[in-house]
Amino acid sequence: MASTGSTTVYGIRHHGPGSARSLRAALTRQRPDVVLIEGPPEADDLVALAADPDMRPPVALLGYVPGEPRQAAFWPFAVFSPEWQAIRYALDASGCLTQGSLTVIVVGVRAEIMRA
């Protein structure tokens, strides 16, 4: 896909089984070189944990301010989450998130868990 210079953006419904199926089919059909996944930038290094064969949904990311448990946010993933399917596509297509022909980048929307 990189050779065409095109960018495709998929609008998805979080935790929507139909969105997850459609996204996985589109990624398989288009075979992109780069997959961008919206999420907290603090989780960039954690995405690679999805390569562990024991990591199976349901799973979640938890962001928090140490000592401030009320200042927390979480991002759940189920097998029918489009984000999970995008991560799994990337793993299946390249063998890992940091090597091979496919690059996965988590595009962050910073969680508002900072002190006010």
Residue ranges and their predicted role:
Residues M1-A116:
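Compositional signal for N-terminal targeting/processing segments
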